[in-house]
Amino acid sequence: EGRLESVADQDPRKGSICIPNSGGCTGYTRLVPVTMIDVAGLVPGAHKGRGRGNQFLSDLARCDALIQVVDASGSTDIEGNPVGSGGSNPIQEYEFLTAELDAWISGILSNGWERGARRVQAEGERALNDFILDRLTGIGANERHVSVGISSVNEANPDAGMPWTWTENEITILASAIRTQLFPIFVAANKADKASTESW
């Protein structure tokens, strides 16, 4: 009573009942609709407004995941300009993107941090979560992202102390941990057929 029977080996559905509200099913496999946007134009210093700057980063706020297309051949510089051989390598391109995102989120957090930290000092730990969440809801952060970020600061630097004593280093750790949760990054290697071992 109230229990489901185990799935028989002969059941082609393997226990799947596919009746989606959106999307569809093919052979009892759920097809989930996604929207992809092409956000081009990230350059070093975008978090400071260089290039498309904050417009580029604001476009990312609409994304649930990122697919970074990197030049596996190493024939372009970090800004995507053709340079022949000796350009940036895919690892540099990935690190560049994560550093820009971390700096962008750090900037959002740092703006008003002292005021928020005083609020935390007066109201307690819950106020810290609320302050960070208030700062980052515009880019899609939720309570879980904030909790993971705060835990990361405490793990990376157990002597970090109270939030009102945090330095730029702790805020960067917080931003990086939140970015990792908020924007999972998948890397697509473009021009991999032309890549040499030196480009990696």
Cite the ranges covered by each PLM segment.
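Conserved C-terminal guanine-recognition region of P-loop GTPase G domains, centered on the G4
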Residues: 23-31, 52-200
